[in-house]
Amino acid sequence: MSKLSDLVPKNKFDTSTINSLMMLSESKLAQILPDLILWIADFNWPIAAELIPILAKYPSSIIPVIKETLEVQQNDTILKYWVISKLIPNLSSVYQLMLIDDIKRIILNPSNSETDEEVVEQAIFLLENIEMLN
């Protein structure tokens, strides 16, 4: 593979680059994390579950991407749902705590779509689990 962009899945069935992604250094993987996180937007996609360990591998690099994904103006509430229910639980509690304000914002001041798509319920469940562990 000549370019990092070649490692980004081309479709929801494209798991051909998973091993190569796992071998990337943090600095290289960080460059494509915003593209990779989009592939967990539907957890029925074969690629989604395989990307979770890769996305969670370097928590300090994925935290800013998660924060951006959870912003109120981001319209992809299905992606928010899967980030909250599948990706964040795979981070250590130290990194989960870095996302507390973002999670509380969803709970206390959700957008209409965050309420409609059950993102709020997932945020409450996640917050309860984080607080239980700490």
Predicted regions, residues:
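Amphipathic alpha-helical interaction modules
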Residues: 34, 38-82
